[in-house]
Amino acid sequence: QIFNQTKCDGVKIEGNAELVDVIKYLTKKNIPVMAHVGLQPQKFSSASKFKIYGRKEDDLKNILNDCKALEKAGAISLLLEGILTEIATQITFASKIPTIGIGASEYCDGQILVSEDMLGMFTEYHPKFVKKYANLCSNIQNAIKRFSSEVNNNKFPNKKFRYD
């Protein structure tokens, strides 16, 4: 009911093969599911716990098996985050559904970045795979400082910005 009321196009769920039953249930209800594998930031409270997926010996086998299971369960696409290039490439070529990469190489079918990261909204930690296309944090801070200064120095508001 909520899905229909919000008019969203689908849901994204972080996890691995443990999600198979959830994905099957949702797809039976005609709710498209994007499965998010690899680095799963919503599961961590601290950026220091982020780790790149694929450095352990069993990672390749595990994630390939997870992706096959998620695809078979009905996922419409796979979001691959923070995964080594070799693994992301193998997943992309093995999958019948699109792969979307965020820190998973140019070999995925599509790419995404978190808007706040690519727009430079944060000055703290950001993953290696984030390219900043702007520095809005600095621009916003400067705008607020200018506003505050103009208010404190009685330069704003002025005649230009009032109704007489």
Segments (PLM) and residue ranges:
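Alpha/beta enzyme core
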Residues: 1-164
